[in-house]
Amino acid sequence: METSDELKQRIGDLSYEVTQHAATESPFTGEYDNFFEKGIYVDIVSGEVLFSSLDKFNSGCGWPAFSKPIENRMVTNHDDSSYGMRRVEVKSREAGSHLGHVFSDGPKEAGGLRYCINSAALKFIPYDQMEKEGYAQWLTLFDET
């Protein structure tokens, strides 16, 4: 099992603070905020599949925004009353990594939710690398129907 120090060394200080201590990266600074390439986003800690570029949108909030996870079972929601606010925290199911928060002000045509996720909690897997990286089963997400 990976120690805290080993994890911090593998993913970096910011990703460690975000995923393990529920820190928040500064708005408009994350690698994936204004990034719209085709592929999937996985938990930087565990590699578990979380979000698809098909569900990513520009919310203008300063963090990557998604209308939904690839499958609802991939994330867990938790009440968060930190900083005097009432929010819903989003964590990855397997690793329990803090990802961000979910709000009910997303695009109505896509279900009305906005998953506001820290770039530091994510790793992007480009579509053309998904098979090589072990995510071939998710390629069908991008099949045209």
From Swiss-Prot:
Its EC number is 1.8.4.12. One of its GO terms (biological process) is protein repair. Pfam families: SelR (PF01641). SUPFAM superfamilies: Mss4-like. Transmembrane segments: none annotated. Keywords: Oxidoreductase. The active site is at C116 (nucleophile). One of its GO terms (molecular function) is peptide-methionine (R)-S-oxide reductase activity. Residues 4-127 form the MsrB domain. InterPro entries: Met_Sox_Rdtase_MsrB, Met_Sox_Rdtase_MsrB_dom, Mss4-like_sf. GO terms for cellular component: cytoplasm. HAMAP family: MsrB (MF_01400). This is Peptide methionine sulfoxide reductase MsrB. It comes from Streptococcus pyogenes serotype M1. The gene is msrB.
